[in-house]
């Protein structure tokens, strides 16, 4: 079997949180193109349904939509059970839901801080644990968490201390779970994208003025494209990465 065949995800089942648009939509599409059945998990159910239909029509795979608030433990636990029941199992997941609030630290409210931490860190913890428990009891699997380059550096010129802190914590959570579960068949890795030109970013009145500055600081002189994250996620979800855990891909 050649490397391209080994990279395929035929027979695998997985879900993507924040999967209705942006990075999550691209990776969900890639998983399905590689042969997996996928659940689009998002708090925006209407958009998740639209994305699920598009991917199913494009790939011929079974793609479902599930409305979930990833900060609600009961909803997350129910989502994992629904994925396993409707798709026939759970082999991988991409925990991608997240937000960013730009505000100077001294002006950021405690409510704003908590909102970012709750979605970006607590939401990934809840999803990791729910998916991890299923995988530990059912032969293993692969968990992919979306962190950020902001876990490694301080972005400028925009102030975003809560986002930076939350994403740094995601990487350490990823490593901790990877060590705990390594000998039990569950791998946990993270990706740390740079500036990615998602539809929301490219159409944001507050972010568009910053794009030229970001591009100037990038060695490639441009933002990344969401689809440029597809290959690493397909690799991590599949069986060619079985010796890879606790790693962060920047």
Q: What would you call each of these model-derived segments?
A:
Residues 9-38:
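Canonical Rossmann dinucleotide-binding motif of NAD(H)/NADP(H)-dependent dehydrogenases/reductases
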Residues 222-250:
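C-terminal substrate-recognition "lid" of short-chain dehydrogenase/reductases
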Residues 133, 179-183, 242:
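Alpha-helical segment proximal to the catalytic Tyr-Lys
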Residues 128, 166, 174:
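Active-site helix of classical SDR
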Residues 45-46, 67-78, 110, 227-228:
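The beta1-alpha1 cofactor-binding region of Rossmann-like NAD(H)/NADP(H)-dependent oxidoreductases
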Residues 148:
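Residue(s) in the substrate-gating loop at a strand-loop-helix junction
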Residues 104-105, 109-117, 159, 214:
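Substrate-binding pocket helix/loop in short-chain dehydrogenase/reductase
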């Amino acid at each position: 079997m050649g490397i391209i065949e080994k990279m395929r995800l035929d027979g695998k089942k997985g879900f993507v949180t924040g999967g209705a648009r942006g990075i999550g939509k691209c990776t969900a599409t890639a998983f399905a193109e590689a042969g997996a059945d996928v659940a689009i998990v998002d708090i925006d159910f209407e958009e998740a349904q639209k994305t699920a239909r598009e991917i199913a029509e494009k790939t011929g795979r079974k793609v479902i939509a599930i409305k979930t608030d990833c900060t609600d433990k009961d909803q997350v636990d129910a989502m994992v059970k629904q994925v396993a029941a409707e798709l026939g199992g759970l082999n991988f997941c991409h925990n991608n839901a997240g937000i960013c609030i730009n505000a100077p630290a001294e002006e950021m409210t405690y409510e704003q801080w908590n909102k970012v931490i709750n979605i970006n860190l607590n939401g990934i913890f809840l999803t990791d644990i729910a998916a991890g428990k299923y995988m530990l009891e059912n032969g293993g699997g692969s968990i992919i968490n979306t962190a950020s380059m902001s876990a490694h550096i301080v972005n400028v010129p925009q102030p975003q201390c809560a986002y930076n802190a939350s994403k740094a914590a995601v990487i350490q959570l990823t490593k901790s779970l990877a060590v705990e579960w390594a000998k039990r068949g569950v791998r946990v890795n993270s990706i740390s994208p740079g500036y990615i030109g998602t539809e929301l970013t490219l159409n944001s009145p507050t972010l568009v003025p910053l794009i030229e500055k970001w591009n100037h600081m990038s060695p490639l002189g441009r933002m990344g494209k969401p689809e440029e994250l597809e290959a690493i996620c397909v690799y991590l979800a599949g069986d060619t990465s079985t010796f890879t855990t606790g790693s962060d891909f920047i």
